[in-house]
Amino acid sequence: MIIKNVYSREFSKIDNIQKRKTVNYNICEVNNGISKIYGINISEITMNKMKEKTVENISSNYYKVSNILQFLYENSIGIISFKDIIEDLLNE
């Protein structure tokens, strides 16, 4: 799997609400020998700790996955809810 960083967003610390963190929005590519299949990976880096989650096999259409990734980035969707948002967007 190839993971390519497309967007990165910095969040500041807000006392009792949010930790300082960096969120990376990435496209994943898997070549199964016949075609390329794309997914989305989001990673959050907080003080030397990194969490990441991936939704694989979203589509073979790069532009569709790229548009979903842009939506997640522009709306600051984080690692907790991005899987549900992707599912909703694919079902529209």
Enumerate the language-model features and the residues they cover.
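Generic alpha-helical secondary structure signal
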Residues: 11, 15, 29, 42, ...
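Negatively charged, low-complexity tracts enriched in Asp/Glu with abundant Ser/Thr
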Residues: 1-24
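A short, structured beta-strand/loop element
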Residues: 32-54
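Mixed-charge, Lys/Arg-enriched low-complexity segments
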Residues: 2, 47-92
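A generic structural micro-environment signature
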Residues: 7, 33, 61-64
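Short amphipathic beta-strand and strand-loop transition segments with alternating hydrophobic
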Residues: 24-31
